[in-house]
Each structure stands twice: as structure tokens, then as C-alpha cells.
Amino acid sequence: MPVLDLIDAVEQAYRDVAGGRDASPARSRVAMPNGDLLLMPGLRRGGLGASVKLVTVTPANAARGLPTVQAILLWIDAETGAPRALLDGAELTAMRTGAGTGAATRLLARADASVLAQIGAGAQAAWQVRAVLAVRPIRE
């Protein structure tokens, strides 16, 4: 999906949730012995589907050479309740977070903004930069 299309989709999703057309209830947190389990449900009204993202945050995984944050997203047919897709939630989170940054940049930054400072180089960093580059003429 082109980055601008992703930014448009995320921006519209924010509007749909804010306008009550879609639902995005607060996430639930379950403490686990070595971290947390986070559950984030969502519903696209109009029969488009429902989803739940399951995220584990396990800080000790860094010493194991494993990601400290792991996630999956289950997409469900809203009419039948049948599972339709199981997706990599970590990559989707990075894409959505980056697109949110792109939407915010498009709405809040000056149109001629040309300098970007990226703090951090984690899993979401590349999508953050891609999204800003898509909406502003960044030169440095």
C-alpha cells in the first residue's frame, strides 16, 4: 500500500472512531509473570469486520535476543464471527503509528517544513520517517 494511501486510511479511521462510526474500546492489560498482555479490540461498522490485536511486552526478551514487543492481529467477519485473517501485529502497529505521524504532520506542520529529527531507531522508526517524507519536502 502506498504510504499516502495508508496515511489517508488512518486519518479516516481516526475520524470514524471520533465520530462514533467505528468503535475502538480502551485496551485491556493483563499482567503476566515476565511482562504484560495487551488486548485491543476494534469494530468497523457497516459489516466491514472486527479485530483484536494481542500484544505481549516482555522486557527480558532483549537479553534472549528476541523482540520485547510481539503482536498478532485477528481479523473477524463482523456478520458471521468467523476468523478471516491472522496478521503480523508488530508490522501493522509500526505502519499505523507511522501513518498517524504522517497525518499529524500533514495537519500540524508548516507546508514548507524541510528538516526532520528522528529520535530512536526502534521498530517503528522507518515508518515514522516514510510517513513524514510522504507529506513534507524534507531535505535534511
Specify the residue positions occupied by each region the protein language model found.
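Glycine-rich adenosine-cofactor-binding loop
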Residues: 98-101, 109-135
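N-terminal ligand-binding/catalytic initiation module
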Residues: 1-94, 102, 112
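Short, intrinsically disordered, charge-balanced linker/junction segments flanking boundaries
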Residues: 1, 136-140
